[in-house]
């Protein structure tokens, strides 16, 4: 039945219909474990990201193909998946590198990340925390329990939260840590993927020693409006 849904989803006329069917069919009320290219994932169909993976058999193809190409250029010592969600990047790249650290602060996402690693019998090191510029506690916020991939670390300067009815915003207390205090290596070739919903600069501020003391390739998912501040910070610190 999955192959039928994948086939239908390729046609524009079915792009919106098929995900709706998945949400409503009793068959898809619970999670399902599906086989992808070289790994398995347990997917939850109330999540739009999980439905996309189920229907396309892949996720963020352009970004991950570009990232994969970097592993083919030279030997990489370590991959850091910051903002791992339920682990797609880490699982996909495991056949390229087995030394992977995955970071995910949201407790529900983290449980799913751990489950996906377990069903593949992969040895990926996980951290249930957000990367930050200090060690301690903070909180994340989100507005929909079915869209936890968009969880954001709370920042009083982040205007995005003002777009929502404060009464409907959900908060969760989390641990935060500086990458510099978690990973102490030098002269290594490291690829870092960062997808942290406007928290990018804070992550980089807590990883400045790691960046300066190693050969780093960064792939950051970022809004156009935030590109300059990130690039300026990296240039100022010799990246």
What are these regions (language model features)?
Residues 1-239:
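Phosphate/nucleotide-binding beta-alpha loop and adjacent structural elements of enzyme active sites
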